[in-house]
């Protein structure tokens, strides 16, 4: 394990909250859910550009919980239950340390 992963784990453990990521059922594939820890934050005014809107959030998660659940990578259209409300993934960016996938940075709205 690298330093970036350990730093990310500490941040999510200290500031994170429990949330649920949901892949909706499509084309005969059943709905899948995974409970995980994530660290949400609002985008700062200087970060609001392009398709990002005021009120959108960035959520940092680890890859460990997704891997353990066999969930796969989060993608646009997945749902996230955050603080009791449901938001929709607008995008997700994988986070690597070297060649190792260590997490995802999610862009959510709702």
Predicted regions: what they are:
Residues 20-110:
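Short, conserved turn/kink motifs that form compact alpha/beta structural patches or helix kinks used as
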Residues 1-32:
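Active-site-proximal polar cores
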């Amino acid at each position: 394990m690298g330093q970036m992963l350990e730093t990310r784990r500490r941040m999510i453990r200290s500031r994170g909250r429990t949330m649920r990521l949901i892949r909706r059922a499509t084309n005969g594939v059943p709905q899948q859910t995974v409970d995980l820890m994530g660290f949400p934050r609002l985008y700062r005014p200087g970060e609001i550009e392009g398709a990002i809107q005021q009120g959108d959030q960035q959520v940092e998660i680890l890859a460990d919980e997704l891997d353990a659940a066999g969930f796969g990578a989060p993608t646009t259209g997945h749902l996230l239950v955050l603080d009791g409300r449901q938001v929709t993934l607008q995008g997700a960016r994988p986070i690597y340390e070297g060649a190792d996938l260590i997490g995802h940075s999610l862009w959510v709205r709702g």
